[in-house]
């Protein structure tokens, strides 16, 4: 509202006066600003509390290193590694194996340069075949592919030595040497393969002699392979005891 103010010079100057409502609105705006600042301060306090609590927890558990400090609380952590793939292990009791012992041989005619195959006992005394290993018709049959240790000991015995310059009439009764061969027969190979061979001279041996030949080694075999033992003179093989002449194989 406007009022006239006299200045003493005969003139009146109008003065603009603020109404009462405007003063109330200015005071209201000032109070609202003060309350907003108070609410903001309270909100900051409430938000900072969980942050401070989390930092305190990290410090207590040793997960946060304080700059300038070399010490930190030790923590015990349990490491759990994922299980790694392990090769399949077959217990020895489940692996194919066989141990054959000698039996009395029946001499059969064969070619001059051909080695006779021995017959074996497979289920009496010390002899056995286990876990699908099979013996049939002089052959030890391999049931599954793998690395096998094959062994054999053949003991020869004689009563006279007929080597050197002995007459040809008696010479065919006794050879100059004795030979043992472990042979593999496979369907995938056209001819028998000699795996192991052992030879000894008997010319220097006097009467009533015994001479063992042992063979043994590891071979990679396929399912269906057949093994046999051949000798140069089947009539000289000692079959009196099963611990003198034997033949066997087992999967490693």
From Swiss-Prot:
Membrane topology: Single-pass type II membrane protein
Molecular function terms, GO-annotated: cytokine activity; tumor necrosis factor receptor binding
Cysteine disulfide partners in this protein: 163-203
Domain THD: start-end pairs: 96-252
Intracellular or extracellular location(s): Membrane
GO cellular component: extracellular space; plasma membrane
Membrane topology, Cytoplasmic segments: 1-39
Positions on the Extracellular side per record topology: 61-252
UniProt-annotated site: Important for binding TNFRSF6B, residues: 188, 191
Key words, A-Z: Cytokine, Disulfide bond, Glycoprotein, Membrane, Signal-anchor, Transmembrane, Transmembrane helix
Origin superkingdom: Eukaryota
Listed GO biological process terms: cell surface receptor signaling pathway; immune response; positive regulation of canonical NF-kappaB signal transduction; positive regulation of extrinsic apoptotic signaling pathway
Principal location listed in the UniProt entry: membrane
Membrane-spanning parts: 40-60
CDD domains, sorted: TNF (cd00184)
Sugar-bearing residue positions: 134, 230
PROSITE patterns for the chain: THD_2
Record note on quaternary structure: Homotrimer.
Function: Receptor for TNFRSF25 and TNFRSF6B. Mediates activation of NF-kappa-B. Inhibits vascular endothelial growth and angiogenesis (in vitro). Promotes activation of caspases and apoptosis. Promotes splenocyte alloactivation.
Family: Belongs to the tumor necrosis factor family.
PANTHER family reported for this sequence: TUMOR NECROSIS FACTOR FAMILY MEMBER, TUMOR NECROSIS FACTOR LIGAND SUPERFAMILY MEMBER 15
Protein name as annotated: Tumor necrosis factor ligand superfamily member 15
Natural source organism: Rattus norvegicus
């Amino acid at each position: 509202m406007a009022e006239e103010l006299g200045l003493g010079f005969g003139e009146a100057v109008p003065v603009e006066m603020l109404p009462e409502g405007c003063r109330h609105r200015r005071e209201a705006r000032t109070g609202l600003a003060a309350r907003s600042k108070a609410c903001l301060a309270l909100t900051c306090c409430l938000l900072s509390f969980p942050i401070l609590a989390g930092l305190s927890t990290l410090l207590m558990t040793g997960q946060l290193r304080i700059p300038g400090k070399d010490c930190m609380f030790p923590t015990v952590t349990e490491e759990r590694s994922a299980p790694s793939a392990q090769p399949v292990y077959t217990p020895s009791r489940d692996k194919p194996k066989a141990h054959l012992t000698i039996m009395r041989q029946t001499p059969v005619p064969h070619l001059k340069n051909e080695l006779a195959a021995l017959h074996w006992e497979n289920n009496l005394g010390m002899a056995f075949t286990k876990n699908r290993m099979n013996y049939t018709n002089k052959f030890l049959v391999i049931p599954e592919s793998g690395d096998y240790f094959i062994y054999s000991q053949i003991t020869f015995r004689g009563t006279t030595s007929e080597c050197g310059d002995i007459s040809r009439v008696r010479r065919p009764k006794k050879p100059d040497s004795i030979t043992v061969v472990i042979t593999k027969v496979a369907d995938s190979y056209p001819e028998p393969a000699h795996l192991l061979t052992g030879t000894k001279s008997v010319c220097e041996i006097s009467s009533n002699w015994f001479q063992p030949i042992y063979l043994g080694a590891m071979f990679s075999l396929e399912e269906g392979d057949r093994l046999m033992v051949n000798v140069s003179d089947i009539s000289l093989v000692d079959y009196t005891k099963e611990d003198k002449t034997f033949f066997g194989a087992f999967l490693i």
